[in-house]
Design a protein with these regions (language model features):
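Hydrophobic faces of well-ordered beta-strands that scaffold small-molecule active sites
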Residues: 1, 20-22, 47-52, 92-94, ...
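N-terminal small/glycine-rich loop or linker at the start of catalytic domains
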Residues: 1, 49-64, 96-100
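Acidic-and-aromatic substrate-binding clefts and catalytic sites of carbohydrate-active enzymes
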Residues: 2-3, 22-35, 100-102, 138-142, ...
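Short amphipathic alpha-helical segment that frequently serves as the phosphate-/nucleotide-binding helix
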Residues: 6, 34, 109
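Acidic (Asp/Glu)-rich catalytic clusters
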Residues: 9-14, 29-51, 79-88, 120-125, ...
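Glycine-/proline-rich flexible loop or hinge segments
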Residues: 18-23, 58-66
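Active-site acidic/histidine proton-transfer and metal-coordination neighborhood
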Residues: 63-164, 174
Length: 180
């Protein structure tokens, strides 16, 4: 199959898949995004999620309260609207980044909620949804968002149809266990 995303999509369609996730969609060229969109349409597949922003794996961003980090994130969200329209996506993944070990968790949570409220205001008019993805601490140590109850609390506080949870069973079985 190789590295060509068009070949990969065709293979997925051939074996029965009906949707496609591409975390790196934002970094693909506009022409490739359009080719992907056309291929998905032709093959009767839907575009699943793509990552809507730069994820900081090594330093706090959304949890930090840093205005420049917030503005960068919101700009990424704005730019992702065009990507979503281009590839017929409704859902985009958001990972709030690293914990700030020098800051109380309640303040970090407030910072994340405030930023996501602003992002929701940007997404709602376009009927787009960011999905918060809790990632397990074993594979991604030090991240802010690790558990589904935490994601639920944040989404309830954001209170927007544009803020939901991506419940990745792989991560949640490792992190929370006993899911059955």
């Amino acid at each position: 199959i190789g590295d060509d995303p068009i070949d990969q999509i065709n293979y997925m369609a051939d074996i029965g898949f009906t949707a496609f996730e591409d975390n790196g969609m934002r970094s693909r060229s506009v022409s490739l995004q359009e080719k992907i969109s056309n291929t998905l349409l032709k093959r009767g597949m839907k575009m699943g999620v793509f990552v809507a922003h730069k994820i900081y794996w090594d330093k706090p961003n959304l949890s930090s309260g840093d205005i420049d980090m917030r503005n960068e994130f919101l700009n990424d969200i704005k730019n992702s609207i065009e990507v979503a329209k281009r590839v017929n996506a409704k859902w985009m993944t958001v990972v709030p980044g690293k914990l700030d070990f020098r800051r109380d968790m309640s303040y970090q949570t407030s910072n994340v909620i405030e930023t996501l409220k602003r992002a929701s205001d940007i997404l709602e008019p376009h009927d787009l949804v960011m999905v918060l993805e809790p990632l397990n601490f074993r594979d991604h140590p030090g991240l802010f968002l690790t558990e589904s109850p935490q994601a639920f609390q944040i989404c309830k506080a954001v209170d927007s149809p544009s803020c939901k949870i991506l419940f990745d069973i792989y991560h949640q079985q490792i992190q929370e266990g006993n899911l059955i």
